[in-house]
């Protein structure tokens, strides 16, 4: 497929959110291998920009996200109706999830719980939307694979979409611009009706006839927003040049999944001459071998009238046109023929997951590690001990290419009074390459300077990451504290950008250091397009600064309180001024408690240290803090019903924003340069004496409104205590690491 057309070169450069919703019953089990080979793997290859390979660097950074939802029937009780996998950007890992599905149960049922699966998929897309706030709109695809119609029952397990029927859910999918596709081994009218109801508003015109582009005449394949790697015969000339002359069994590659394949163009006759060097006996033998393979896979004989035409003219003809087999291996995915745009080492960068607990599946990689606040699987404290740090992946089978020192800067672990204080750390490190590779490091400097970048800013650079070579970094644990700090930062939403000075006469100008939490190794990516990569980083940082500036302007216009419940604006302004300032410490992006969002990776200021008071902070004399009161048996004003909005604020305090903010001096890293101070000048309100150090959050100068009596002093401390609420902050990782002071040198 030529670049720019509907092929993998185009799809691989698009950031997509892909959710497969699969029926996990025995009704689908006998057919799944054929569907996987003909449709699912080609679809994954389309989004991945090439065949999934184990060398894909996935799981921590990157663009396209894959997630898997497996639903069952009502006879699976007491088990849950739905199993959900946390999103991953590794296409290879996603394929291992597909291979690990256990198709069991459902034998006595004629329907399946499609509504439960689709409601879970919609919740995943809600999580994707929060994760993608930095890069905006993505290409979203929901693929339903099932072999039974839906129950006439609403969804019950989903919290957000409980009570919605299957038709309601597919209508919501279409209205949100999510491309809905269906793959089934049978032609079920109920499923076709769902596909038609999921049509986006812009595509309400009558569907064109050739929508069913199945490989097998019994299959039903209805797709939107998705094509196979070879496209629909729209460019027969270039396709001819890429067809292998021996024509191995071509059928497994699957049909083109475009909704309306174009008709063959005039230069078709030359393609009929492609197999001219093959005798009729060879063609017949290939057809017989293919039929035997299909029967062995449980698919039955092929549709014989079409097979000779497909063998003679690959890539041309009606919707049953075939693709060459090397585009997709029938077994575990390898990389026999990646597209020209992709390199042998397919590197996939990953955005943080949505925090859903991964379900263990046979054959799936180990999911060791704890879920950090950004949704990234980070090293657990036990893994950060000396034995784990010393046991980095063996590099005995690799060649040493460079040895030197890596230096970076981070905020000191205890909150410093001076916001500009930085701690410089360095570690001896070695760079290793595989045998047979040659990396010219003679001109590399002895010390490499690394700058930290939030991983969320790198999601649009996926194609540049794929077009790069991979090296492995190994750090010695002479300085255990620095090594722990590197693990902590790199495992919680950051990538390292290593700049080579212009004075060094080496070919490499920039190198990206990434940490794989699954493989527990540090990988260095050296993009082949150095200038393009530098320009890409500069562009994403510029865009990030523009977004920050817009948010700052919105806050200055009085829009900083968007996280409060609706209707509380006047109350926050007139009656709880410190609460408004507390809300302004966070960007105006709502974040539900039930989802571990990409808080640590969005590049936004997140006061991760506010859930607990800083060291040395007073434990709150009565009336010391007047933010929204914590839930529990607290003393409220005597007549909260006099103001319904105030009552709503008291009964439903805003989530994690509550707490004591850091001192004014340490708030500088939460504001872009030149921003006005967020906290008002201190007041000595309510006649309370100032005990100990100055109060972190002065009380307001005014008391409650005239219609309410003054708030009685609260006994004990008012600070939040007990268990964490909402996303749990990662101790030790300072939020200032992700702000503009780190990114300035990259502009």
Swiss-Prot record:
Biased amino acid composition, Low complexity: 598-611
Biased composition (Acidic residues): 738-747
Mutagenesis or variant effect for residue 140 to W: Found in a patient with syndromic intellectual disability; uncertain significance
Annotated GO CC locations: core mediator complex; mediator complex; nucleoplasm; nucleus; transcription regulator complex
Xref: Gene3D superfamilies: Mediator complex subunit 25, ACID domain
Residues covered by region (Interaction with the Mediator complex): 1-226
Subcellular location: Nucleus
InterPro entries in the cross-refs: Med25_PTOV (IPR021394), Med25_PTOV_sf (IPR038196), Mediator_Med25_SD1 (IPR021397), Mediator_Med25_VWA (IPR021419), vWFA_dom_sf (IPR036465)
Region (Disordered): 233-274, 299-390, 548-747
Database matches in SUPFAM superfamilies: vWA-like (SSF53300)
Consequence of substituting residue 39 to C: In BVSYS; the mutation impairs interaction with the Mediator complex
UniProt keyword list: Activator, Charcot-Marie-Tooth disease, Disease variant, Intellectual disability, Methylation, Neurodegeneration, Neuropathy, Nucleus, Transcription, Transcription regulation
Region (Interaction with RARA): 564-653, 640-707
Protein's UniProt keywords contain ATP-binding: no
Motif extent (LXXLL motif): 646-650
One BP annotation, GO: positive regulation of mediator complex assembly
Assembly information from the UniProt record: Component of the Mediator complex, which is composed of MED1, MED4, MED6, MED7, MED8, MED9, MED10, MED11, MED12, MED13, MED13L, MED14, MED15, MED16, MED17, MED18, MED19, MED20, MED21, MED22, MED23, MED24, MED25, MED26, MED27, MED29, MED30, MED31, CCNC, CDK8 and CDC2L6/CDK11. The MED12, MED13, CCNC and CDK8 subunits form a distinct module termed the CDK8 module. Mediator containing the CDK8 module is less active than Mediator lacking this module in supporting transcriptional activation.
Name of the molecule in the record: Mediator of RNA polymerase II transcription subunit 25
Source organism of this protein record: Homo sapiens (Human)
Gene: MED25
């Amino acid at each position: 497929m030529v670049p720019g057309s509907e092929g993998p070169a185009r799809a691989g450069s698009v950031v997509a959110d892909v959710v497969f919703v699969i029926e996990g019953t025995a009704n689908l089990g006998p057919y799944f291998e054929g569907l996987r080979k003909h449709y699912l793997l080609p679809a994954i290859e389309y989004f991945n920009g090439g065949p999934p390979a184990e060398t894909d660097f996935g799981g921590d950074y990157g663009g396209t996200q894959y997630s898997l939802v497996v639903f069952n029937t009502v006879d699976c009780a007491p088990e849950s109706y739905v199993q959900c996998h946390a999103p991953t950007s590794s296409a290879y890992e996603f394929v291992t999830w597909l291979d690990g599905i256990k198709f069991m149960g459902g034998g006595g049922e004629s329907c399946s719980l499609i509504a439960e699966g689709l409601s879970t998929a919609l919740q995943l897309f809600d999580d994707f939307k929060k994760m993608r706030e930095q890069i905006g709109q993505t290409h979203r695809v929901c693929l339903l694979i099932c072999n039974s119609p839906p129950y006439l029952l609403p969804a019950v397990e989903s919290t957000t979409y409980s009570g919605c029927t299957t038709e309601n859910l597919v209508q919501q999918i279409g209205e949100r611009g999510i491309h809905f596709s269906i793959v089934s081994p049978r032609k079920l009218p109920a499923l076709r009706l769902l596909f038609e109801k999921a049509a986006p508003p812009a595509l309400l015109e009558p569907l064109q006839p050739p929508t069913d582009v199945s490989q097998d005449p019994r299959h039903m394949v209805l797709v939107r927003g998705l094509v196979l790697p070879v496209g629909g015969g729209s460019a027969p000339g270039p396709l001819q040049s890429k067809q292998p002359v021996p024509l191995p069994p071509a059928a497994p590659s699957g049909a083109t999944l475009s909704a309306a394949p174009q008709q063959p163009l005039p230069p078709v006759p030359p393609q009929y001459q492609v197999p001219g060097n093959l005798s009729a006996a060879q063609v017949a033998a290939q057809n017989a071998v293919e039929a035997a393979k299909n029967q062995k896979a449980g698919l039955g004989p092929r549709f014989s009238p079409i097979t000779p035409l497909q063998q003679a003219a690959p890539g041309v003809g009606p919707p049953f046109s075939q693709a060459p087999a090397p585009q997709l291996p029938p077994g575990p995915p390898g990389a026999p023929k990646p597209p020209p745009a992709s390199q042998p080492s397919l590197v996939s960068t990953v955005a943080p997951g949505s925090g859903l607990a991964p379900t263990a599946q046979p054959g799936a990689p180990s999911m060791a590690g704890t879920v950090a606040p950004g949704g990234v699987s980070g090293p657990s404290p036990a893994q950060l001990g000396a034995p784990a740090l010393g046991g980095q992946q063996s590099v005995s089978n690799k060649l040493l290419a460079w040895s030197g020192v890596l230096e970076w800067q981070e905020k000191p672990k205890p909150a410093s009074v001076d916001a500009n204080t930085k701690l410089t750390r360095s570690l001896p490190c070695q760079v290793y390459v595989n045998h047979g590779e040659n990396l010219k490091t003679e001109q590399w400097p002895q010390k490499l300077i690394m700058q930290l970048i939030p991983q969320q800013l790198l999601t649009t650079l996926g194609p540049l990451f794929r077009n790069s070579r991979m090296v492995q970094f190994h750090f010695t644990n002479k300085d255990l504290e620095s090594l722990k700090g590197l693990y902590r930062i790199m495992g919680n939403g950051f990538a390292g950008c290593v700049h080579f000075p212009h004075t060094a006469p080496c070919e490499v100008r920039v190198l990206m250091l990434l940490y794989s939490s699954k493989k527990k190794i540090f990988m260095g990516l050296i993009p082949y397009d150095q200038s393009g990569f530098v320009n890409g980083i500069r562009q994403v940082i510029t865009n990030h600064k523009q977004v920050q500036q817009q948010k700052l302007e919105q806050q200055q216009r009085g829009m900083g309180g968007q996280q409060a419940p609706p209707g509380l604006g006047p109350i926050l302004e007139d009656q709880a001024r410190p609460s408004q300032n507390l809300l302004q410490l966070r960007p105006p992006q709502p974040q539900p408690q039930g989802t571990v969002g990409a808080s640590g990776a969005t590049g936004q200021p997140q006061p991760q240290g506010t859930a607990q008071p800083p060291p040395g902070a007073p434990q709150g004399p009565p009336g010391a803090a007047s933010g929204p009161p914590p839930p529990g048996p607290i003393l409220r004003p005597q007549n909260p019903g006099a103001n319904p909005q105030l009552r709503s604020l008291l009964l439903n305090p805003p989530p994690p924003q509550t707490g004591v903010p850091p001192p004014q001096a340490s708030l500088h890293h939460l504001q872009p340069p030149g921003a006005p101070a967020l906290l008002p000048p201190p007041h000595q309100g309510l006649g309370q004496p100032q005990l100990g150090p100055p109060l972190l959050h002065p009380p307001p100068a005014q008391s409650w409104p005239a219609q309410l009596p003054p708030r009685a002093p609260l006994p004990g401390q008012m600070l939040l205590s007990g268990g964490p609420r909402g996303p749990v902050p990662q101790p030790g990782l300072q939020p200032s690491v992700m702000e503009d002071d780190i990114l300035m040198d990259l502009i």
